[in-house]
């Protein structure tokens, strides 16, 4: 019995440990700064000032167009969601059966207890009702800014950007990560773009330390909030 309890406790601990998301770690290679690509040497040097791959319109502003350039993304994210459901189900049924003969013969209805005659009549009735009501609401807001680098330039001119910012505070670290696609036309003259203009955006705001741990429920509370809890 003791062995069974130990195995059950270890299994439950392993399952609960698997439900805990790993804390973010710095220096993720995917979000590492992308350095500018070294241009290939030209086959012949004609002495011209113009170099292929570094052309720019004389009437346009200087914007980030090449791999390794820096872009500042202004975070302005607000989401509000609400959902409600209301359902009700009622079912009532009844039936009665009366028999005067059984296989053509009239049965003896004398009650041996002497408390009225017996009968073959039968009846039933049922009533069932179910009612449910649920509501959910969620609101999120994220403002700030993060400076990232151009990771790639697609053939159609769309710019792929990504980067991260770590801020070390007294009681832990704060992390902001973003990755997505930006149109060159949406970049302002000061190389800034709003996060609402970032397509396929992947924005992460997280942290480590005592403040982040205080917002997480304990392992015992997670058991009652997990699908393993049968009630």
From Swiss-Prot:
Membrane topology annotation: Lipid-anchor
Transmembrane segments: none
Compartments it resides in: Cell outer membrane; Bacterial flagellum basal body
Covalent lipidation (S-diacylglycerol cysteine), chain numbering: 19
Primary localization: membrane
GO cellular component: bacterial-type flagellum basal body, distal rod, L ring; cell outer membrane
Keyword Metal-binding: no
Lipid-bearing positions (N-palmitoyl cysteine): 19
Signal peptide positions (record): 1-18
UniProt-listed PROSITE patterns: PROKAR_LIPOPROTEIN (PS51257)
Nucleotide-binding found in the keyword field: no
GO terms of molecular function: cytoskeletal motor activity
Subunit structure, as described in the record: The basal body constitutes a major portion of the flagellar organelle and consists of four rings (L,P,S, and M) mounted on a central rod.
Role noted for this protein: Assembles around the rod to form the L-ring and probably protects the motor/basal body from shearing forces during rotation.
Family: Belongs to the FlgH family.
Protein name: Flagellar L-ring protein
Gene name, Swiss-Prot/TrEMBL: flgH
């Amino acid at each position: 019995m003791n062995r069974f309890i130990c195995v059950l406790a270890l299994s439950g601990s392993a399952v609960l440990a698997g439900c805990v998301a790993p804390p973010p770690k710095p220096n993720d290679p995917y979000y590492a700064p992308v350095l500018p690509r070294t241009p290939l040497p030209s086959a012949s040097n004609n002495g011209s000032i113009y170099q292929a791959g570094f052309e720019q319109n004389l009437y346009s502003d200087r914007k980030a167009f090449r791999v390794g350039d820096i872009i500042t993304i202004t975070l302005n994210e607000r989401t509000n969601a609400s959902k409600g459901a209301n359902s009700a189900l009622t079912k009532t049924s009844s039936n009665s059966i009366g028999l005067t003969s059984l296989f053509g013969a009239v049965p003896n209805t004398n009650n041996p207890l002497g408390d009225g005659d017996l009968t073959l009549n039968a009846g039933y009735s049922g009533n069932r009702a179910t009612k449910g009501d649920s509501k959910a609401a969620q609101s999120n807001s994220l403002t700030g800014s993060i400076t990232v680098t151009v990771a790639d330039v697609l053939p159609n001119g769309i710019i792929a950007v990504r980067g991260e910012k770590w801020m070390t505070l007294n009681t832990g670290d704060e992390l902001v990560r973003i990755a997505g696609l930006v149109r060159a036309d949406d970049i302002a003259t000061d190389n800034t773009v709003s996060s609402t203009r970032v397509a396929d955006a992947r924005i992460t705001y997280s942290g480590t330390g005592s403040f982040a741990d205080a917002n997480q429920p304990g392992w015992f509370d997670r058991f009652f909030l997990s699908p393993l809890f049968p009630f």
